[in-house]
């Protein structure tokens, strides 16, 4: 009996000891968690019971050179519902259906869904949001947001660009200067129960967003509007495919206007222009049969094998392209300015040198024709430029030779991109030096068999007429802080010593005679010395008989303050650059030279040597 009692006592002590050890372990673990891991579990609890919603920051504005707003913000609302807080569901459903123009069944689905918060509609007009807020219905949230707004509609659409549904830039300056414009979002912190549903009575904590900075650009609305009207007019008159006009300051690279018609509506960027919509309709859409198992738009295919959605996206991408910098073309005779500058700089030609044009030039086994098949006869170099004579410039190219011509091509910056502050700039398409023969050299010398962008041509010619400084064509000028105080000035690279001052002066003088006495006479303006060069180039394939008519001009010729380039794609009827494109630049210059404060002067003494 005594043995049994002793045995039972031992068992009790063992159990008691185990319990003590377990309690000690539990208390120790509890002390450890409460004292040493409290921060971790506090954060975990907060994560479970707090919900964070973003408050979008107001995006910075884009302003033109004179302070006119080109891109701004409109206040819109996001309407949401919180299931647990709704007391009158039928009233909520009826109100939201009426005000938001949404089917009641769709609203009911969101109202009856058990979730922390359910968005009913975004981008609601502020007036509508205010009306819903005034009804003070429990469980209905009205949060203010921002939507990008473009006061000038389609003006400079391919330059300014637009934003997406998340208010982030997609194309143009909107995406290039995203970090400056976007601002810093704020937060709304709310407390939720175990199911993740917001607890209304506990309120919410807000962190205010920081507004984005604004961007001042060199583009001038008045100049852009006039240039855009001029482009539309000539496009309609000549039934052209498209027209591009670039106007920039050759001294500092600031771009005053960049026109690419047809433009598109920045406030409705996903709707095709009429001509592109016609292309979509003509692409041969095949409607699926009634028993087709694909009900989405993706099932609808065009005759090209692409879905309707894919084809539309292709056309949208085409509509958004900026041909002045996204597309390359054969510049034709405007490129003779580059050959002229290289020849003068290298000393292989001078203004008084004599040439003979029989209407063609034989290079190796090829006869390369002049635009004037009967020939220009005997002429000096200046007259060759006035006549836009191909054999003269072929001869200058051959005198330079492949090695030197390629050297100047590189020295002038033509093998590099300009570095302009718009995304998607295309590079030059040029023969490799090792693959160039004399025939290729001959065709390059008058602007054929290679391709560059319009902005590249404008930047290169600027460096040849401004004294030899390679400026970067750009739009960005300065940044404004949210409080409208001036922020940083935007600075772009400048490269010195492209050509000598003497060569630059000779180029200006020769090009002035092209307008005053030669093929560019349709750009002449009384009282102003205008320099320029015409071009008429045939697109590939040559057999299609499609042309690009262009004119590059600058003023005043003695000290250029503005350079203009007009390119007309596939004009109908008369297609010569001097006849079609030169008058466009003349009309623009007549209008904007006084606007820029450039006064008329005596131009009688401004002439080229040897002419």
Show the residue positions of the predicted features.
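Periplasmic/cell-envelope proteins involved in peptidoglycan metabolism and beta-lactam response
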Residues: 1-306, 319, 328, 403-415, ...
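Beta-lactam-recognizing serine transpeptidase/beta-lactamase-like catalytic domain environment
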Residues: 71, 193-204, 245, 250-334, ...
């Amino acid at each position: 009996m005594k043995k049994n009692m002793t045995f039972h006592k031992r068992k009790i002590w063992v159990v008691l000891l185990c319990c003590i050890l377990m309690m000690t372990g539990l208390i120790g673990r509890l002390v450890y968690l409460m004292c040493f891991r409290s921060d971790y579990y506090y954060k975990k609890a907060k994560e479970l019971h707090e919900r964070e919603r973003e408050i979008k920051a107001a995006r910075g504005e884009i302003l033109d050179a004179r302070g006119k707003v080109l891109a701004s913000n409109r206040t819109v609302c996001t309407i949401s519902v919180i299931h647990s807080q709704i007391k009158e569901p039928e009233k909520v459903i009826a109100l939201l259906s009426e005000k938001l123009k949404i089917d009641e069944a769709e609203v009911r689905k969101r109202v009856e869904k058990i979730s922390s918060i359910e968005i009913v509609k975004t981008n609601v007009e502020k007036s509508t949001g205010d009306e819903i807020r005034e009804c003070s219905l429990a469980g209905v949230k009205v949060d203010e947001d921002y939507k990008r707004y473009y006061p000038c509609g389609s003006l400079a659409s391919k330059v300014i660009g637009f934003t997406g549904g998340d208010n982030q830039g997609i194309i143009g300056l909107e995406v290039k200067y995203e970090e400056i414009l976007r601002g810093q979002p704020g937060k709304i912190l709310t407390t939720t129960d175990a199911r993740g549903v917001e607890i209304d009575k506990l309120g919410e904590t807000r962190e205010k967003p920081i507004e984005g900075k604004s961007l001042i650009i060199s583009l001038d609305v008045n100049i852009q509007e006039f240039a855009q009207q001029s482009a539309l007019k000539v496009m309609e008159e000549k039934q052209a495919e498209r027209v591009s006009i670039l106007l920039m300051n050759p001294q500092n690279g600031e771009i005053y206007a960049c026109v690419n018609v047809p433009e598109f509506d920045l406030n409705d960027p996903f709707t095709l222009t009429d001509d592109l919509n016609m292309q979509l309709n003509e692409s041969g859409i095949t409607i699926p049969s009634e028993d087709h198992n694909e009900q989405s738009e993706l099932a609808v295919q065009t005759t090209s094998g692409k879905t309707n959605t894919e084809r539309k996206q292709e056309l949208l991408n085409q509509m958004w392209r900026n041909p002045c910098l996204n597309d390359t073309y054969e510049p034709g005779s405007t490129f003779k300015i580059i050959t002229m500058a290289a020849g003068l700089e290298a000393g292989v030609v001078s203004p008084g040198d004599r040439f003979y044009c029989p209407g063609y030039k034989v290079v190796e086994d090829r006869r390369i024709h002049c635009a004037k098949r009967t020939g220009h006869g005997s002429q000096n170099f200046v007259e060759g430029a006035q006549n836009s004579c191909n054999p003269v410039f072929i001869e200058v190219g051959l005198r330079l030779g492949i090695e030197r011509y390629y050297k100047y091509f590189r020295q002038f910056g033509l093998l590099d991109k300009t570095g302009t502050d718009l995304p998607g700039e295309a590079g030059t398409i040029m023969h490799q030096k090792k693959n160039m023969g004399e025939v290729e050299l001959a065709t390059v010398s008058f602007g054929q068999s290679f391709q560059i962008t319009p902005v590249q041509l404008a930047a290169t010619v600027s460096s040849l007429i401004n004294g030899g400084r390679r400026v970067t064509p750009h739009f960005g000028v300065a940044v404004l802080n949210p409080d409208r105080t001036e922020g940083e000035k935007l600075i772009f690279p400048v490269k010195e010593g492209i050509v000598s001052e003497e060569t630059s002066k000779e180029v200006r003088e020769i090009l002035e005679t092209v307008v005053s006495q030669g093929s560019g006479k349709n750009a002449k303006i009384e009282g102003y010395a205008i320099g320029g060069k015409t071009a008429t180039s045939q697109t590939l394939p040559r057999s299609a008989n499609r042309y690009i008519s262009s004119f590059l001009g600058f003023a005043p010729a003695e000290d250029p303050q503005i350079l203009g380039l007009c390119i007309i794609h596939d004009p109908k009827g008369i297609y010569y650059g001097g006849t079609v494109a030169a008058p466009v630049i003349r009309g623009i210059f007549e209008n904007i030279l006084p606007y820029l404060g450039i006064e008329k002067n005596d131009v009688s003494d401004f002439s080229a040597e040897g002419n």
